[in-house]
Amino acid sequence: DSVFGVHESPRNLEAKLFGWNVTKTFCARNGLGLIVRSHQSKQGSLGFEVMHDNLLVRVFSARDYESHGNCGAVLLVSRDDERDLLHVRPQVLHSLTKALDGVT
């Protein structure tokens, strides 16, 4: 969470990197408590990453994407009607390759 402001991404010219301050301002202006994004694998990751003071979650569902050894993940969303809240919990989908190691 050390990035501040908006910067060009090293991935390509169209993409941007944005810091925690941008996320915080965007959420405050739009009445949001969480942003969920996808479409970016991180090598060796658990398939999700919580960032920007818990305001941003990156989730990637494809396991072992391009042989990166990453786990996939999904977000489980449930509702608490008493407190009018949504609960969001990551669930890791472990790599089939690693799960099958040693199985004959």
Regions found by a protein language model. Name each.
Residues 1-104:
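Feature recognizes metal-dependent phosphohydrolase scaffolds
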